[in-house]
C-alpha cells in the first residue's frame, strides 16, 4: 500500500502558493515589483497544473477589427488550436477568439480593485470574435457558438474584515454584465464563484483555497469545450493597411 496522501498533496499545493504570495508581499517594497511577483506565482501555477492545451500569460487581447483590450495580468488562452500568438518586445498579444479566461492578480482585494478588475474583464469581453463553419469530409459543420470568457480576481489578502463578507459581495455585484467576475481566490482566506442557478456569488472559506480555485477553474474550462474556428482572413486584411 502506498504512503501517498491525496489530501496532503492538495494541501501542499495550496501551501506552496500561499507561501510564495506571502513572500512576494514581504520581500518587495515597490508596488510594481510586488505586483509582478504575485502575478508570476499565479501564472506559474496555471501553466503547471492546467492541461497543456491551455497557456497562461500576461497579455493584451486583440480582435479582427483592430481593437485591443487593456493589459491583462493573467490570460488563459488556447495553444492547441490558435493559429497565431503575437510576441513583440516581450509583450504577448492574443486573438480574442483564443481566450478562455482573464484574471486580475494583485496583493489584496478591495472595492477599488474589484471595480478595476471588472473594467479589465469588460475590455476583453467587448471585443469582436469570429467563428467559422468547420469543414469535414462530408461538408461543413455549423459555426461553433462563441464560448463565454471567464473573468476573475486573484489575490493573497483582502482589505475587508471579514475577508469574504458582505462588502466583498457588494463590490462584486457592482457589475453583473460585461465586467462580471465569475470566480476568484483570496489565497489566505478562501475562494468565490458566481452561481448561475441562484444568480448570486458563493464564498467558500478556507479549505485549501488555491487548490479549490484551481479545480473549479478546470471544471469550468471543461464545460467551455474548445474555442471557435478563427477567421484568419478577417485578421489578414490588416496586411494591406
Swiss-Prot record:
Highest taxon listed in the record's lineage: Bacteria
Family label: Belongs to the NucC endonuclease family.
Enzyme class: hydrolase
One Gene Ontology molecular-function label: metal ion binding
InterPro entries in UniProt: DUF6602 (IPR046537)
This protein's name: Endodeoxyribonuclease NucC
Organism: Escherichia coli (strain MS 115-1)
Effect of residue 53 to A: Loss of endonuclease activity
Annotated effect of mutating residue 19 to A: Wild-type hexamer and endonuclease activity
Subunit field text: Self-oligomerizes. Forms homotrimers; in the presence of cAAA the trimers associate face-to-face to form homohexamers. The 2 cAAA-binding sites are on the exterior of the hexamer at the three-way junction, there are maximally 2 cyclic nucleotides per hexamer.
GO biological process: defense response to virus
Keywords: Antiviral defense, Endonuclease, Hydrolase, Magnesium, Metal-binding, Nuclease, Nucleotide-binding
Needed cofactors: Mg(2+)
Reported effect, residue 81 to A: Loss of endonuclease activity
Mutagenesis or variant effect for residue 73 to N: Loss of endonuclease activity, no phage immunity
Site features described as Gate loop latch, chain residue numbers: 136, 141
Keyword Oxidoreductase in annotation: no
Gene name linked to the record: nucC
Ways its activity is controlled: Activated by cAAA and to a lesser extent cAA and cAAG; cAAA and cAA are products of its cognate CD-NTase. Cyclic nucleotide binding causes hexamerization. Cyclic nucleotide binding causes a series of shifts that enclose the cAAA molecule, enable hexamer formation and juxtapose pairs of active sites to allow dsDNA cleavage.
Residue(s) at site: Binds cAAA: 53, 81, 226
Phenotype when changing residue 226 to Y: Loss of endonuclease activity
Record flagged with keyword Lipid biosynthesis: no
Role summary: Effector DNase of a CBASS antivirus system. CBASS (cyclic oligonucleotide-based antiphage signaling system) provides immunity against bacteriophage. The CD-NTase protein synthesizes cyclic nucleotides in response to infection; these serve as specific second messenger signals. The signals activate a diverse range of effectors, leading to bacterial cell death and thus abortive phage infection. A type III-C(AAA) CBASS system. A cyclic nucleotide-activated dsDNase. In the presence of 3',3',3'-cyclic AMP-AMP-AMP (cAAA), and to a lesser extent 3',3',3'-cyclic AMP-AMP-GMP (cAAG) and cyclic-di-AMP (c-di-AMP), endonucleolytically degrades dsDNA. Binds one cAAA in a pocket on one surface of the trimer; cAAA binding promotes hexamerization, which is necessary for nuclease activation. Also binds c-diAMP or linear di-AMP with lower affinity. The nuclease digests dsDNA to about 50 bp lengths with a 2-base 3' overhang and a consensus recognition site of 5'-Axx|T-3'.
List of residues binding Mg(2+): 73, 104
Entry EC no(s): 3.1.-.-
Amino acid at each position: 500500500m502506498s504512503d501517498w496522501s491525496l489530501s496532503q498533496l492538495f494541501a501542499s499545493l495550496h501551501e506552496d502558493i500561499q507561501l510564495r504570495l506571502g513572500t512576494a508581499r514581504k520581500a518587495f517594497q515597490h508596488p510594481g515589483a510586488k505586483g509582478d511577483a504575485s502575478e508570476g506565482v499565479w501564472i506559474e501555477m496555471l501553466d503547471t497544473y492546467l492541461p497543456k492545451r491551455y497557456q497562461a500569460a500576461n497579455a493584451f487581447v486583440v480582435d479582427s477589427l483592430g481593437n485591443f483590450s487593456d493589459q491583462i495580468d493573467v490570460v488563459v488562452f488556447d495553444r492547441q488550436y490558435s493559429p497565431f500568438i503575437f510576441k513583440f518586445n516581450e509583450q504577448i498579444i492574443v486573438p480574442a477568439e483564443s481566450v478562455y479566461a482573464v484574471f486580475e492578480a494583485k496583493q489584496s482585494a478591495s472595492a477599488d480593485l474589484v471595480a478595476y478588475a471588472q473594467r479589465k474583464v469588460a475590455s476583453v469581453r467587448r471585443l469582436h470574435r469570429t467563428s467559422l463553419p468547420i469543414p469535414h469530409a462530408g461538408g461543413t459543420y455549423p459555426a461553433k457558438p462563441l464560448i463565454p470568457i471567464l473573468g476573475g480576481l486573484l489575490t493573497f489578502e483582502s482589505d475587508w474584515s471579514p475577508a469574504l463578507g458582505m462588502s466583498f459581495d457588494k463590490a462584486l455585484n457592482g457589475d453583473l454584465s460585461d465586467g462580471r467576475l465569475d470566480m476568484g481566490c483570496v489565497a489566505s482566506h478562501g475562494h468565490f464563484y458566481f452561481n448561475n442557478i441562484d444568480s448570486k456569488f458563493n464564498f467558500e472559506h478556507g479549505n485549501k483555497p488555491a487548490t479549490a480555485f484551481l479545480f473549479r477553474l478546470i471544471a469550468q474550462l471543461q464545460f467551455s469545450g474548445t474555442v471557435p474556428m478563427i477567421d484568419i482572413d478577417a485578421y489578414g486584411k490588416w496586411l494591406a493597411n
